[in-house]
A protein has these predicted regions:
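Canonical tetratricopeptide repeat
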Residues: 73, 108, 146, 172, ...
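TPR alpha-solenoid repeat register
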Residues: 70-71, 105, 139, 169, ...
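N-terminal leader/linker segments that initiate helical-solenoid repeat arrays
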Residues: 17-74, 80, 88-89, 100-101, ...
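Alpha-helical repeat scaffolds
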Residues: 54, 58, 84-97, 119-133, ...
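Residue-level recognition of tetratricopeptide repeat
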Residues: 42, 76, 111, 149, ...
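Short coil turns that delineate tetratricopeptide repeat
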Residues: 65, 99-100, 134, 164, ...
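Terminal, low-structured helical/coil segments at or just beyond the last alpha-helical repeat
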Residues: 255-265, 510, 515, 522-561
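Register position in tetratricopeptide repeats
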Residues: 46, 80, 115, 153, ...
Length: 561
């Protein structure tokens, strides 16, 4: 908060020292109440408290046509509160709406024009936004993509001279071919879905949608038959459920390639995801709400809004969004219950959260395997390993012996047995998992680490760890494991090399820093060792057992050193 206040004082100084700023030559013409509300709005806006920011901005509307920075913050706050139409009206009614000084203002006006099917006006606003295309790396991509889209919507053909943005261009090509009903639409979606350079599984939904829209039901069924509920995303699980239940009309209710607004909406959703992946929650929600404005039918996309609010600690807002997912959307309803349980855990602790989820789970008739899987994971995370094993076993018994999903479930159940100290069953599950998938680095790591801790089959454990590290050399947990393995066989120089890398990869992990302290002690670097042990005590994630052991080590050092 102190830093925010300092930032505000700097802003105030700039306002009063600069002779010409924005549309207002001086702040003397504004009364103190307007300025107070405006600057309170800035503080709230900077602190990500958008609801309060909007209240303060609403109370200082006199600045609307006199100060550009106010217009930007006010319109942003409106969009973030999902008042997109109001934000558009504010911009349209500003005294100089053809000389706006921020890119997103023109995006709002373009969205308004698209909603009104006024493609010429949308193109005009897009051209005006050209001045901002180099402000950041996304603006140019957005500008060029919208230019291609508008050309296609107007002329019913694709633009010949267009920029190539790699995989984003492949996505755009698939949607534009779908819009134009091109014969090669199918191959475009398949090329996208099977692209080895990333996870494009979301677009399986749009491929299924395309097949159903063109009455190719059997092909749509063939696609969903290849999907597994456990390993599929929310959207694909819901899609499979609709196809399995012959609810084909549900697809057209939320998206159509024939609707240009739906296509632009999906592009904006992609941009929202890109911002979310960079932890820019504000920009992510801005583009997501703009996406929802263009296609309000696709309410399933709101799961990202809920997730963003949850990650930002805005739990009341998250719960409000989650409430739209009712039992009609089976998998999104379950997502809602899980997220509500996670919020309860944050507020009241794990026990109350798991009790809430268990009570909701008990009311679900014939829960599918994905729901059972999630419940098992909740129990495992809450250290109720007996219950976790019970639910993992229910799913494992129904799966084919060679299923990769079975391999993952055996890994999870084996880990639960290991935590209970039932090493025989743990080893059986973990070795069976490796029989199905011998190159799973995480199973190799888990089994090998367990053996090392038990002083069991040390040479074989080292071989497995070396294989795991070769497969995942930048994974901090695997790096820590192989470093700790060298520690256990008293090769402290090699151990230090790996654990140091693990600390660099995961600097706030209590176990890794504790391990590094132990190794430094063995290397007679005692002052540094105590530094890392003390650092672990300051970490919120350090459990009481680690803290207890470290307090002893700080005083006595490592025994038998």
């Amino acid at each position: 908060m102190f830093n925010k206040l300092i930032k505000l004082f700097v802003i105030l100084g700039l306002f009063y020292q600069t002779p010409v700023y924005s549309k207002s030559a001086s702040f003397n013409e504004f009364n103190s109440r307007d300025l107070s509300n405006y600057f309170s709005g800035i503080i709230a806006f900077e602190n990500k408290d958008n609801s309060d920011a909007l209240k303060f901005f609403n109370a200082s509307k006199v600045l609307l046509n006199k100060h550009d920075a106010y217009l930007k913050r006010y319109s942003f706050s409106l969009v973030l509160e999902n008042k997109v139409a109001q934000a558009i009206n504010v911009i349209k009614n500003s005294s100089n709406n053809e000389n706006l000084d921020f890119f997103e203002a023109y995006l709002l006006l373009i969205a308004d024009s698209l909603k009104k099917n006024n493609l010429n006006q949308a193109e005009k606003y897009l051209n005006l936004s050209l001045q901002f295309q180099n402000e950041n790396r996304f603006n140019f991509v957005i500008y060029e993509t919208l230019r291609q889209y508008l050309y296609t919507f107007k002329n019913k053909k694709t633009l010949f001279n267009k920029k190539n943005f790699g995989n984003i261009s492949i996505i755009n090509q698939a949607f534009l071919r779908c819009y134009l009903k091109k014969e090669n639409t199918r191959s475009s979606f398949l090329n996208l879905i099977n692209n080895p350079d990333g996870d494009y599984s979301r677009y399986i939904f749009f491929y299924i949608n395309y097949l159903i829209e063109n009455n190719q039901i059997e092909e749509a069924k063939a696609v969903t038959d290849q999907l597994e509920y456990i390993s599929s995303t929310l959207l694909l699980s819901q899609s499979k459920s609709w196809v399995d239940g012959k609810k084909f009309k549900e697809f057209g209710k939320i998206f159509s390639c024939n609707n240009h607004n739906d296509i632009v909406s999906e592009f904006l959703f992609l941009i929202s995801n890109l911002y979310s992946s960079q932890e820019d929650i504000e920009k992510s929600n801005f583009y997501l709400n703009l996406s929802n404005y263009l296609n309000p039918k696709f309410i399933l996309n709101s799961s990202l809004v809920a997730e963003n609010f949850y990650l930002n600690g805005e739990y009341d807002k998250a719960k409000k969004i989650l409430s739209i997912f009712d039992k009609k959307y089976e998998f999104y309803y379950w997502f809602r219950l899980k997220k509500e349980a996670q919020i309860i855990i944050k507020d009241k602790g794990y026990e109350e959260g798991i009790d809430y989820l268990s009570s909701k789970f008990s009311k679900i008739k014939n829960p599918n395997e994905k729901i059972v899987f999630d419940v098992a994971n909740f129990y495992k995370n809450s250290k109720n390993y007996e219950k976790a094993i019970e639910y993992y076993t229910k799913i494992i018994s129904s799966l084919d012996d060679n299923s990769e999903i079975k391999s993952d479930l055996l890994y999870r159940r084996g880990g639960s047995y290991e935590r209970l100290g039932d090493y025989q069953k743990a080893d059986e599950d973990l070795k069976y998992s490796l029989k199905i998938n011998p190159d799973d680095a995480y199973v190799l790591n888990y089994l090998a680490y367990s053996w090392l801790e038990r002083d069991y089959k040390i040479d074989q454990a080292m071989e497995m760890l070396e294989k795991a590290y070769a497969l995942r050399s930048n994974d901090p947990y695997i790096t820590d494991s192989i470093g700790w393995a060298y520690y256990l066989i008293e090769n402290y120089i090699e151990a230090e090399k790996y654990i140091k890398k693990a600390v660099e990869l995961m600097p706030e992990d209590p176990t890794v820093n504790d391990h590094y302290g132990d190794i430094l002690w063995k290397l007679n670097r005692n002052i540094q060792a105590r530094y890392f042990w003390n650092y672990v005590l300051s970490l919120d994630d350090a459990d009481e057992d680690i803290k207890k052991n470290i307090n002893i080590k700080i005083i006595e050092g490592l025994h038998n050193s």
